[in-house]
Amino acid sequence: MYMELYLMFSNFFKSIRWCKVPAFMQAKVEMGLVNEVELKSLLEQETDSPQTNAASLMEQGSLRERRAKAPRNSVVQSFKIVILSNKLNLLLPFGPLAILVHYLTDNKGWFFLLSLVGITPLAERLGYATEQLSCYTGATVGGLLNATFGNVIELIISIIALKNGMIRVVQLTLLGSILSNILLVLGCAFFCGGLVFPGKDQVFDKRNAVVSSGMLLMAVMGLLFPTFLHYTHSEVHAGSSELALSRFISCIMLVAYAAYLFFQLKSQPSFYTEKTNQNEETSNDDEDPEISKWEAIIWLSIFTAWVSLLSGYLVDAIEGTSVSWKIPISFISVILLPIVGNAAEHAGAIMFAMKDKLDLSLGVAIGSSIQISMFAVPFCVVIGWMMGAQMDLNLQLFETATLLITVIVVAFFLQLEGTSNYFKRLMLILCYLIVAASFFVHEDPHQG
């Protein structure tokens, strides 16, 4: 009897230990058709198969090699590498000059222009520092870093604008950031990559593009229903149902974005790194970092703080610039501000495309659009809810229709062949020009 109890508990604990084995294999063990040695061998094959570990092993080896080559620069050397090595940084003094003009004169137009020029080199350096940091983190996390540090500016501007009751500025700026990323940033990255590789169709992971397109379409769906509810006048409680629906959808979108991050970083790591590792094999000479990991983090913090400061001043100058330049506020919010706010993604995506790393370019441009639409927009709705501001997902009919058509066009291009050619490069840029022209002649009746 004791021997039977021992065998029963022994088999029980073995089943817990090997719970990852399929149920039919556990049944064969209990029936004596497979012994323990064979089962352990099958378990090792299941968990250590080449398909699941090849990409992670390649990336780990590449990361170890880069970390071993990490430079140790002094403060002066780091300053020379990051600040003095780029001719575009000659525009850096325009930032302090813009602040000086802001306090000494009332010319909002000049202040706005100087701020735009001053932010441009800072945003490019953000892309550079993020690329350096991605050398120590890997391709997937590197793409998320590019998107995150680029969108910090939009989040700061949005929260400040919400505090000031400028809900429409928040909506238009975030909308413009999405449009700029999926059309202008991606189109320019493809175009610059084509200039470096003129006779080559650059390849990207089509499976990744399909998932990204699905996320963008889900974001559009979340924005469509509050707009349709408003314009069909079918609310159960007029004035409150639209806001309640927006807050509910925002919570769902935040959960979906968290699941997307988990899927991208944990569940399917090889799914997203296979193509990037192939690109790294052909361009290892370009992968040696110029600054250390902590230098990159410090420079990222400095640049982000300075860009955010200038961006905050830009918000206050929007109305004055609209009057001075005689252009609609919607054009400034949807076109001009996002171009500067997305300069980090713009520079990063172009740099990656010029190194034939189109998956990283897509990770920056499309990843940033997903982060804005699935995180920044619903996050602002929730923050506005906490502040008592009636921020909703109703972007109005013209703006929502523009976003819907744009996402459909981009999703169609990304799912065609998994390649970039001159036709796609040209079409994306021309589509953005159409959008820009539309907002130049569009007067927003809800501004204010």
From Swiss-Prot:
Membrane disposition: Multi-pass membrane protein
A Pfam family matched in the record: Na_Ca_ex
Transmembrane segments: 82-102, 110-130, 142-162, 179-199, 210-230, 244-264, 296-316, 335-355, 364-384, 394-414, 426-446
GO MF: calcium:proton antiporter activity
Gene symbol of the encoding locus: CAX6
Protein's UniProt keywords contain Membrane: yes
Topology feature Cytoplasmic, residues: 31-81, 131-141, 200-209, 265-295, 356-363, 415-425
Origin species: Arabidopsis thaliana (Mouse-ear cress)
Name this polypeptide is given: Putative vacuolar cation/proton exchanger 6
Record family assignment: Belongs to the Ca(2+):cation antiporter (CaCA) (TC 2.A.19) family. Cation/proton exchanger (CAX) subfamily.
Span list, region Cation selection: 150-185, 341-376
Subcellular localization: Vacuole membrane
Lineage: superkingdom: Eukaryota
Any one Gene Ontology cellular component term annotated for this protein: vacuolar membrane
Extracellular side: 103-109, 163-178, 231-243, 317-334, 385-393, 447-448
UniProt keyword terms in alphabetical order: Antiport, Calcium, Calcium transport, Ion transport, Membrane, Transmembrane, Transmembrane helix, Transport, Vacuole
Keyword rRNA-binding: no
Job description of the protein: Vacuolar cation/proton exchanger (CAX). Translocates Ca(2+) and other metal ions into vacuoles using the proton gradient formed by H(+)-ATPase and H(+)-pyrophosphatase.
